[in-house]
Amino acid sequence: MKIEFFGDLASIATVILAFLAWRQIVLLRKQSTTAFEDSLTEHYRRIMESIPTDIWLRSELNTLDKERHDRCRDAIYRYFDLCNEQALLYNMKRVREDSWIEWCKGIRGNMDLPAFKGVWTEVREKCPDNFTELSALVGH
């Protein structure tokens, strides 16, 4: 009788420990995903630092002087690359749904800015096979 009790107790303890281990794995995976998404957001912020305020206020790219124009154009291209990577990662289930929804809102808003539209048109004409995931998202 006593041996059965300890056997039952050991079984219950094993189940509890298995549950706690599973819960820890779930939490670590969530933490890892959050850190990964945060790194993509930080990458976005670094790119955006090269885009002048005038562009965010709907100015055309050609209103900038040559140096700022070139730096901004390069930053917008890097932004397209980041967005394409984000879309690919979402399709691979490496990004959470709620994060992706927020990113999509931002992507669509940025793609509506004249400077972004201009660079996007140039990219699509010169490299139509690039940025396929981003193309699917923005519809052109």
Role assignments for model-derived ranges:
Residues 68-140:
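An amphipathic alpha-helical interaction surface
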Residues 3-70:
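Membrane-proximal alpha-helical anchors
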